[in-house]
Amino acid sequence: MSHDVSVIGLYILDVLGRPVDAIPPGGNVEFIDEIRLTVAGTAGGTVVDLAKLGLNCLAVGAVGDDEKADFVLATLQRFGVDVAQMQRLKGVPTSSTILNIRRNGDRPALHARGASDHFEIADSALDAVLAPPIIHLGGTGLLAKLDGEPSRKLLAEAKARGRITTFDLLGANDGTLDLISPLFPHIDYFMPSIEEAKQISGAAD
């Protein structure tokens, strides 16, 4: 099967509640309007959106061996995403986030790291993973085994094969620029948020 895009990186389960004005004190209960489960992450959310737009997508990432993984994989398949390169890892949970969505749209997050920290790509998988013409890497900063030199080598190999490369991270801090700057020569399109761009560049505008 030929794919339009390979979407590599962070696949997580998001639990969204809205609107959340405050966490109730003690063991009290606060009623909200909606709770939803979604596939998220700067790879997971991206691949779902691309599939909705009609692209033939290959998902490349890792989930755990739990009920959260069942939901992530079933949802990807429901949208027609090829999950043949998704790794299901025993002994670790699927990475997941609780998002308390405020009325103004702010989304403070509680994240539990999991399978994405153990995700890596074997050399034997490169032909399949890098076969599509577009390669997206998303989630740098929360991909412990893939971050740094493995990501640089992956993107360099993608460019050596003539692929278009796109890149997104997840959050930014004082160490982010050092982490991602070796990747820049191998990235065609980098898509940080405004907040991430300010943090990385040190610019106010």
Residue ranges of predicted features:
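Short, glycine-/polar-rich solvent-exposed loops and beta-turns at beta-strand/coil boundaries
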Residues: 90-92
